[in-house]
Amino acid sequence: MQHPAEHSPLGKTSEYVSSYTPSLLFPISRTAKWAELGLSAETLPYRGVDIWNCYELSWLTPAGKPVVAIGEFSIPADSPNIIESKSFKLYLNSLNQSAFDSREALRAVLQKDLSAAVGAPVGVRLRSLDEVAEEGIGRLPGRCIDELDIAVDGYEQPRPELLRCDAGRIVEEQLYSHLLKSNCPVTGQPDWGTLVVDYRGPALDPASLLAYLVSFRQHQDFHEQCVERIFLDLQRLLQPQALSVYARYVRRGGLDINPYRSLAEVAPDNRRLVRQ
């Protein structure tokens, strides 16, 4: 079956437009991917957000002087659509030679266009470089599982059957791995990321979690769907009292994508990690 992104700019030669062009945004419905996971808009078992950070954001003042900022865009996890990443980049590049009366005027335009594209209200922040620099590089709490010894014999498809837990021992902990990798479903390009699991419930075997995450290595899907699949597989296994799954992906084309799915309505930390 043809992937819905096949008609997007992904994998194609594109003209870079330098004047404001909102029509460049290419929405992709979440419905088909939800259906693959047995979900619908009415039955989502999680809350969450997709945080996009843009490091190549620039526009002009009315006097023609360039301005730069770092953009932070928060797309609700239950929005009808996502935005294809290359089209997002092309849209943001179209601002480069466009004049706006103020930073707030641009923020309002971005919020209007992005909300229209995804079909839900999008949070938009335009942050100064000094503000972001003061935050520094984020360090994850919890336990890194990357040094555990595991044997791996398959990389093509996620393997939830690898996951194990101790139903007789209830814990509250955070586990993370920097070894998450999947591939773009259209171009095959690698997507590198860090995956954080925060939960309260039956003790998850960390080696089994690592083996499971490595099984995504040749899997082709968008960032958002990978995180949703991981969330659902862990929820089915653990039946936890609390669960959140957060991926911090390495940037491409000046954008990084950070999907967060949780049983609770909690705003995730958006400080960038060392590879971002």
Swiss-Prot record:
Q: Which residues bind substrate?
A: I83, E84, S85, H223, E224
| Keyword vocabulary terms for this entry | Cytoplasm, NADP, Oxidoreductase, Queuosine biosynthesis
Q: What is its main location?
A: cytoplasm
Q: Which family does it belong to?
A: Belongs to the GTP cyclohydrolase I family. QueF type 2 subfamily.
Q: Where in the cell is it found?
A: Cytoplasm
Reactions catalysed, as given in the entry = 7-aminomethyl-7-carbaguanine + 2 NADP(+) = 7-cyano-7-deazaguanine + 2 NADPH + 3 H(+)
Q: What is its EC number?
A: 1.7.1.13
Q: What is this protein called?
A: NADPH-dependent 7-cyano-7-deazaguanine reductase
Assembly and partners? Homodimer.
EC class (word): oxidoreductase
What domain of life is recorded for the organism? Bacteria
Function of the protein:
Catalyzes the NADPH-dependent reduction of 7-cyano-7-deazaguanine (preQ0) to 7-aminomethyl-7-deazaguanine (preQ1).
MF terms from GO for this chain are: preQ1 synthase activity
Name the active site residues.
Answer: C184, D191
Output a single Gene Ontology CC term carried by this record. cytosol
Instruction: List, in alphabetical order, the GO biological process terms annotated in this UniProt record.
Output: queuosine biosynthetic process; tRNA modification
Residues reported to bind NADPH: S85, K86, R252, G253
Pathway participation: tRNA modification; tRNA-queuosine biosynthesis
Coiled-coil region list:
none
